[in-house]
Amino acid sequence: MKVNQYEPIPQPEELEIREKEDAMGAYLMMFAALGAGLPLPILNLVAAIIYYYINKGKSLFVRFHSLQSLLSQLPTSILNAVAVFWGARIIFFDYAFTDVFKGYLWLVGIANLIYIIFSIIGAVKARKGEMYYFLFFGRVSYQSVFKKKEEGAHKAMVNQPPKM
């Protein structure tokens, strides 16, 4: 007999509108952070981390979408940060504007476009109360959020007198 090791996935009709909106906000929040943090791409990542920690206790549905949004933002934030600092180095320290840098900018642009498309799809699906799994990050988020916790894992410590 196989025991299910994951919590049941909530269905759209079981979710409150507020949960759907909070899950959608995990994906759309990056657009607001993008406007404020365009020259500093790490601000998007900081905003995603804050959003996750604020909303992780609301429901498994919101926590899943917040974590998936956060994890999927990690690679693009790193790519963007490298592009910004590499570009600043070229501008301020008279390094050459090479074909390698141009190719890297194309890579960063394509990665950001893919991230934006997936984020919009994820936001629409979350607003409908549906689960949407990104290629790698969806599985990691699902396993992290929906895995059942062992009941004996968090035993309370017993107070003891000091050793004599």
List the predicted regions and their residue ranges.
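Hydrophobic alpha-helical transmembrane segments in multi-pass membrane proteins
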Residues: 18, 22-45, 68-119
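Membrane-interface extramembranous regions at the lipid-water interface
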Residues: 2-37, 43-71, 122-164
